[in-house]
């Protein structure tokens, strides 16, 4: 990770650690960098946070001042920006969002011309420019100043693309959607309605501050209750920028990213679509997923946490599906990043083609009890690398053996240490997680 850019772009609290000056300089640099030998063409999307508009204006000012033409997709999912960039010849795209974080935060994700997340070396150049380590970039003058275009059409093309990927009509299927008061509000219902589903929506009225607030994929209990109360066949919950999806079956049971990888991986293998007979996961995936994939004779790869790393592995080895437990799922044939609505459509495809309820299709997946603690710390690197913390984690690992595991890692987006334990029961998970938390507290790492 760099000084400003983490695993998922430049993220921070609006007007504190991420400012309009930062956004302006990002725009200035990108307009110059991509416009050295031609007039750069940049697409911008945003989520529903109040500050997203502020950052949009700053980015536009910086980009156009450097001579780039800017095309505004307005409120739209992150994957739609990737789709528009790669399918319509843009030099790069920018998504203004802090994903699943609360409304006070925001972020700037840059997507290169191939629709992929920006290369680390270019992120480093942007950081150097922000810090004044690169000479001042020249301004454009006269007719060379960039123009700004309303490009809602790009989002509508993305919606049409999603609809075209469905293999069957959804007619008669009752689907619940938790839109997290975020980017999915401009896309998801329209897609499901067009495919014939009976669509029921919650949290679809953004007001600038209610994004992710007790809703969406980080508060899946809301959708669980809704699906059961309304007697729905299935439900889908998205995060603020709709690049991740979790599902709920007809019984109200949560289908997380691991379950989605298992469901779709098995289905793709049956159809001869699982390249290299491999599913790409991250180190946070449940031990039960690996044992269940073993039982189906499906291989797997493990990467660092972040869909960026999942996609890099998929590209390097030619794998066709990968993702994270949190619901970032990448279908390499159709997308270059996690896409929540696309993931929903793929789950629907499995359910309709197999003619079974999702609860039935997942009955052979055995997930270990898992506890994940997010511990706010003073300095996440110092906490993670503290010898006593490492020793406590090692002791737990030895005691669990093959019957569980522990993972202690620093968050890529927050000042947090994540302690994850999997074991045979919730009580055992809590016991071993507490062993590490006690050491973190004793050593003064935990924020007061």
From Swiss-Prot:
Modified residues (Phosphoserine): 99
GO terms for cellular component: cytosol
Gene Ontology terms, MF aspect: magnesium ion binding; phosphoglucosamine mutase activity; phosphomannomutase activity
Pfam hit, one: PGM_PMM_I
Binding-site positions, Mg(2+): 99, 239, 241, 243
Keywords, comma-separated and alphabetical: Isomerase, Magnesium, Metal-binding, Phosphoprotein
Active site: 99
Domain of life: Bacteria
Cystine pairings recorded for this chain: none
Post-translational modification: Activated by phosphorylation.
Keyword Acyltransferase recorded: no
Gene Ontology biological process terms, A to Z: carbohydrate metabolic process; peptidoglycan biosynthetic process; UDP-N-acetylglucosamine biosynthetic process
Gene3D superfamilies listed in its UniProt record: Alpha-D-Glucose-1,6-Bisphosphate, subunit A, domain 3, Alpha-D-phosphohexomutase, C-terminal domain
Enzyme Commission number(s): 5.4.2.10
Similarity comment: Belongs to the phosphohexose mutase family.
PANTHER family per the UniProt record, alphabetical: PHOSPHOGLUCOMUTASE (ALPHA-D-GLUCOSE-1,6-BISPHOSPHATE-DEPENDENT), PHOSPHOHEXOSE MUTASE
Name of this protein: Phosphoglucosamine mutase
Name of encoding gene: glmM
